[in-house]
């Protein structure tokens, strides 16, 4: 097979920025078969597979890419499926540039192989062309409970179901999917794709119980007692939003990004018929610089805002959001106001937001995170006229489970403490992973944690 030594990735087809910023259809349109084969041929098949070491779920990347290069897309899918329960999701939202693609040998001098784009292509091809029913393993006589139907919980559920366990997933919201459903907008991750992955788990025998808030409706002690579950995995995520603590944060027109995106993505609160309408102003400020901030800003634009600002206390080079998401936001007309930070939010006579006061920042020496610390420039305050403020400053785990589970150790941030990478908690038979342990992180890291915990839970039950 001849290698493709083109220094650049095959470009991803996308909607025109001036069209897509007015709709919620997916921005990236995906590779054609020809594009996928050509991109796959850029892989030089390193013997030590550095890309695989960068994948939290350990996909054999050179093997699946080799099958793509040969045009055997179903074989490629089977390789991915051995390690990942959500390939169509990961191909779209994982930060490949800092994981698998960040370790690609081609990336030393040129652009790395488009691993994420190829994973997405393979998953989409399989979904559109293969319609066989999944194999349902014989029940092994044991049953386990999963708390939370996000990426960690779904992965743990899938891996345990494959091993023959009777798995029940308890989800607090009215639909399964967790952050994949409520947090990531349709234009980045179509909900039909997530639903299909969930439907696949149901066909494998996984039961989903929605509207079940563990810690209120049932406790972990009850699940492991009268309900007879031999082990429990806590993948309840981190849905408690953080705020700045500045004057005016309680005004009408101030949202957490978590609330704004949940009501937009899951509840369709922007529709005129909504019973819980969301107010979208004409001038919107989103405070923060991560992927969630980009999602909130781009959603606000699509919901009718005329001007949307990203207000971030560091510079463009320090933005934690994926480079691709920043580029898409810029193309769509999002205005970046960097090196400034809000200090107060002001109200009009009716109690709605009318403006924010910001102060300019400069970067000093690196802080504990390794990034240069932002320092206020005295006397540099200025006012920005906005009518909506969305705070995107991160999230913490909800305290409900830890407060209703005696003996479950958590740290000062409210995250569940686990041993090593296996997810074992201070309570026997209770495992945890994903954002409930790490705080807000990536989808693929949560999946990796769910995978590791599922293996540990199996070993625990089989050795009891």
Which residues are covered by each model-predicted region?
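Ferredoxin-type iron-sulfur electron-transfer modules in oxidoreductases and energy-metabolism complexes
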Residues: 20-38, 59-92, 109-138, 264-265
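Local cysteine-cluster metal-coordination motifs and their immediate loop/turn environment
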Residues: 41-63, 85-108
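Feature captures the FAD/FMN-dependent oxidoreductase FAD-binding
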Residues: 75, 138, 143-147, 195-246, ...
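Glycine-rich dinucleotide-binding loop and its adjacent helix/turn
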Residues: 122-138, 196-216, 241-303, 411-421, ...
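N-terminal Rossmann-like FAD-binding beta1-loop-alpha1 element of flavoenzymes
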Residues: 142-168, 293-301
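Rossmann-like dinucleotide-binding cores of NAD(P)H-dependent redox enzymes
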Residues: 169, 173-203, 207-208, 297-344
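FAD-site-proximal beta/loop scaffold in flavoenzymes
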Residues: 250-281, 366-440
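A conserved FAD-binding loop/helix module that cradles the flavin
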Residues: 436-462
């Amino acid at each position: 097979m001849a290698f493709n030594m083109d220094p650049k990735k095959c470009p991803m087809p996308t909607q025109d920025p001036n069209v897509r910023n007015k709709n919620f259809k997916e921005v990236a349109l995906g590779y054609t078969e020809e594009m996928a084969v050509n991109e796959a041929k850029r892989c030089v098949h390193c013997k030590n597979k550095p890309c695989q070491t960068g994948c939290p779920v350990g996909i054999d990347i050179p093997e699946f890419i080799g099958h793509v290069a040969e045009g055997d897309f179903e074989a490629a899918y089977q390789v991915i499926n051995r390690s990942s329960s959500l390939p169509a999701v990961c191909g779209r939202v994982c930060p490949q540039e800092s994981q698998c693609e960040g370790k690609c040998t081609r990336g030393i001098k040129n652009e790395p192989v488009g691993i994420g784009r190829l994973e997405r292509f393979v998953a989409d091809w399989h979904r559109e062309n293969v319609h066989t029913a999944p194999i349902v393993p014989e029940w092994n006589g044991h049953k386990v409970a999963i708390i939370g139907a996000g990426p960690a919980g779904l992965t743990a559920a899938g891996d345990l179901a494959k091993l023959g366990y009777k798995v029940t997933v308890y989800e607090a919201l009215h639909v399964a999917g967790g952050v994949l459903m409520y947090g990531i907008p349709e234009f980045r991750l179509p909900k039909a794709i997530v639903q299909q992955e969930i439907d696949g788990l149901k066909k494998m025998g996984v039961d989903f119980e929605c509207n079940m808030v563990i810690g209120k409706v049932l406790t972990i002690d009850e699940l492991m007692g009268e309900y007879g579950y031999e082990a429990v995995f806590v993948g309840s995520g981190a849905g408690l939003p953080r705020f700045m603590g500045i004057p005016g944060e309680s005004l009408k027109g101030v949202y957490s990004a978590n609330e704004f995106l949940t009501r937009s993505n899951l509840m369709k609160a922007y529709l005129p018929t909504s019973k819980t309408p969301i107010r979208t102003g004409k001038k919107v400020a989103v405070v923060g610089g991560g992927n969630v901030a980009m999602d909130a800003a781009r959603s606000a634009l699509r919901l009718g805002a005329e001007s949307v600002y990203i207000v971030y206390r560091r510079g463009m080079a320090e933005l934690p959001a994926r480079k691709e998401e920043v580029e898409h936001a810029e193309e769509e007309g999002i205005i970046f106001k960097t090196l400034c930070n809000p200090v107060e939010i002001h109200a009009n006579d009716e109690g709605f937001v009318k403006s924010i006061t910001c102060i300019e920042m400069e970067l000093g020496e690196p802080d504990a995170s390794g990034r240069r610390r932002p320092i206020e420039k005295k006397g540099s305050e200025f006012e920005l006229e906005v009518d909506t403020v969305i705070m995107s400053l991160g999230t913490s785990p909800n305290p409900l489970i830890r407060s209703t589970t005696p003996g479950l150790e958590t740290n000062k941030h409210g995250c569940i403490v686990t041993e090593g990478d296996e997810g074992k908690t201070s309570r026997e038979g209770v495992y945890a992973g994903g954002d409930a342990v790490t705080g807000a992180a990536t989808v693929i890291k949560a999946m990796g944690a769910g995978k590791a915990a599922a293996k540990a839970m199996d070993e625990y039950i089989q050795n009891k």
